[in-house]
A protein has these predicted regions:
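N-terminal type II signal-anchor transmembrane helix
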Residues: 1-56, 94, 114, 239
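Short small-residue beta-strand/loop micro-motif enriched in glycine and branched aliphatics
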Residues: 63-65, 96, 214-217
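Non-catalytic, structured segments within soluble enzyme domains
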Residues: 119-240
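Short, glycine-/polar-rich solvent-exposed loops and beta-turns at beta-strand/coil boundaries
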Residues: 47, 66-67, 99-105, 124, ...
Length: 240
């Protein structure tokens, strides 16, 4: 190696090291700025889901319901395994492997964001990152600031809560459209029966709704919902 090539190599290495240091310092600064704004993960262990006021007849038939959100909490142990599988294969197939942030998926989303001139075409959020958003923890403006907050809180939640606790929160809080929040409420909204009584096709239909709960639910967008259901079933087949 000539003296000139050694100098070029040394310069490149110095620039790379300087860039790495700048990135580390920037991330540290972002963390110090945002961390005080992040709630404690323990908060989500005791979260109370908003449920509407329900009026029943003497023989316990529902006759009226008041409230903006329809929520029917369900324990993870009572959720059909096929629905859990459909949801994970569709929304976050590495849920039980990552520590709150799926770096690979996040990197692909960032690349897509750049290639598509700022248009979001692929979601990079894990189920853990989506829980605070579904519970209204952060405002929906300032996309990049919110994303950093979601990442920091997801890492905290994964350290202090179990995977099953996080998944149960998600299943009970994710929006399904038509005022239905949570899988049990969605089952009654679209099929008039509990989650445990649904067929595989119906469970797959519900699992595909969270990506577009308003435009992609079976009532507002039946064709889109069917296409999404078929995609969920294909992914379940591929994952085995």
């Amino acid at each position: 190696m000539t003296l000139k090539s050694r100098r070029v190599t040394a310069t490149i290495m110095c620039l790379a090291l300087a860039g790495l240091c700048a990135a580390v310092l920037s991330l540290a600064g972002i963390y110090l700025y945002l961390d005080p704004q992040i709630p404690k993960a323990e908060t989500y262990r005791h979260v109370r889901l908003e449920t509407p006021l329900r009026v029943y007849t003497a023989d316990e038939q529902l006759i009226a319901e008041f409230g903006e959100r329809r929520v029917i909490p369900i324990a993870l142990a009572d959720v059909p395994d096929l629905f859990v599988r459909a949801l994970l294969d569709t929304e976050d197939k590495r849920f039980y492997e990552h520590s709150g942030v799926d770096v690979l998926t996040l990197a692909k989303s960032a690349v897509d964001l750049v290639l598509n001139m700022g248009e979001i075409t692929r979601g990079g959020s894990t189920i853990t990152m989506q829980v605070p958003r579904n519970l209204g923890t952060f405002s929906l403006d300032q996309l990049f600031i919110r994303k950093f907050k979601e990442i920091l809180l997801a890492l905290k939640m994964e350290r202090e809560l179990s995977k099953d606790e996080i998944l149960e929160l998600y299943i009970n809080a994710v929006p399904f459209g038509k005022r239905a929040y949570g899988a049990q409420a969605a089952a009654y909204t679209y099929y008039g029966k509990p989650l445990s009584d649904l067929s595989l096709a119906q469970l797959a239909m519900l699992a595909g709704i969270p990506q577009a709960p308003t435009a992609g639910n079976p009532i507002n967008g039946p064709e889109r919902a069917v296409n999404r259901r078929n995609l969920v079933l294909r992914r379940m087949l591929e994952q085995g």
